[in-house]
Amino acid sequence: MKHARQAKILEIIDKEVIETQEEIADRLKKAGMEVTQATISRDIKELRLIKVMTEDGRYKYAPFNSTDNTVFNRLMTVFSKSYVSSDYANNIVVVKTLPGMAPAAASAIDSMNYPEIVGSIAGDDTVLIVCRSEKIAKEFVEKLSKLAKSDDK
């Protein structure tokens, strides 16, 4: 069921300009699949869907292609330019960003698809990242610091 639903979501966003999760739910319902907003949200994350600008200036869902270096490089640039500092406590990493930039930084971190990351939550200027262990958290802080320094601010 999950794979069929996710395949249908990919088919829908390939054929139509879909701007909201509600539109995805509506199209799935028309295809005979009842889903909740939470399920759609999880599917979007698992499918690595991102919002891209259309020619008319609207934003639509599209698959994130990890081989698309342009998008990946943009996300890494956003991260490095928004990064202020990072630290860890036990298996939790806290990333400080410029005001208003935490959601973009979290998106960049999520797009890295590190298996050692359980999940992340973004506020206004802080990203909370849950790692699988304290050792991994320490290593991840070092990775983030190197990544932020790799691009001249």
From Swiss-Prot:
Gene Ontology cellular component terms for the protein in this record: cytoplasm
Keywords, alphabetical: Amino-acid biosynthesis, Arginine biosynthesis, Cytoplasm, DNA-binding, Repressor, Transcription, Transcription regulation
Pfam families membership: Arg_repressor, Arg_repressor_C
Gene assigned in the entry: argR
Gene3D superfamilies: 3.30.1360.40, Winged helix-like DNA-binding domain superfamily/Winged helix DNA-binding domain
HAMAP family hit by this protein: Arg_repressor
UniProt cross-references to PANTHER family, sorted A to Z: ARGININE REPRESSOR (PTHR34471:SF1)
Record function comment: Regulates arginine biosynthesis genes.
Gene Ontology MF terms: arginine binding; DNA binding; DNA-binding transcription factor activity
Organism: Acetivibrio thermocellus (strain ATCC 27405 / DSM 1237 / JCM 9322 / NBRC 103400 / NCIMB 10682 / NRRL B-4536 / VPI 7372)
Protein's cellular compartments: Cytoplasm
Protein name: Arginine repressor
GO biological process, alphabetically ordered: L-arginine biosynthetic process; protein complex oligomerization; regulation of arginine biosynthetic process
Location, primary (coarse class): cytoplasm
Keyword presence, Iron: no
Keyword presence, Membrane: no
Pathway: Amino-acid biosynthesis; L-arginine biosynthesis [regulation]
Recorded family membership: Belongs to the ArgR family.
